[in-house]
């Protein structure tokens, strides 16, 4: 079944089912892209945006596969089981599925925000790609968790009582951050993960799509693509129900990105 040029499907064993969708490209492309989603509350907000980016890349001749991590989105499983090790298995499944379905020779990963932290560990444990693109990546997992905890406390304080005489749900012991399950194992994984030059031990070129006001990444970036100032923001101060769209300036950026990926020469 195809929906507007892309095909949804399940991947992985019955015990670890992942929702995925392939945005196919015409011809016999040699390069394909796996889109690694952001984490927690940033994933549903950017779902339409990531879908539009995948379609745009496919129209440029780059087949793109997007997926939901196990325990998130439309994938099976509970968010209580979410940690970086599970995400690494999911990346194995997603990259293998794209290779199998398209017979590409070169693999590119585009990782949004916290998804970049998962990609770092995936490379450490033997994940193989030809190019990594980090889209507004979270550089310091520990600092991000602290930011989320503070933002979560503010959000809880603003919640109205569910009904008269019932207190607000402000107790963080429910294990959630920004309304999504964030088990202790996931928090511990994120807190000890940073993007640094260790990624380059794997001889994979790394590009970054960042805003001008983003602090310099503590790693060598082979190529930097500036994100338009008016691009949708992942800032924790943004409205929780805000949905991202592929605005004309960002669409132009994705076009330049796709062209650059197609022109990139791999040894």
What are these regions (language model features)?
Residues 1-31:
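N-terminal cap/lid segment of alpha/beta-hydrolase-fold proteins
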Residues 15, 24-68:
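Short, surface-exposed "cap/lid" segments of acyl-processing enzymes
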Residues 40, 69-74, 139:
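Alpha/beta-hydrolase active-site loop signature
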Residues 49-50, 78-83, 239-243:
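Short glycine-enriched, charge-decorated loop/helix-capping segments at active-site entrances
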Residues 72-106:
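Catalytic nucleophile-loop/oxyanion-hole region of alpha/beta-hydrolase
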Residues 108-120, 136:
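Gly/Ala-rich beta-loop-alpha elbow adjacent to hydrolase catalytic centers
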Residues 121, 125:
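Active-site signature of alpha/beta-hydrolase-fold catalytic machinery across serine-
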Residues 126-267:
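The alpha/beta-hydrolase serine catalytic core
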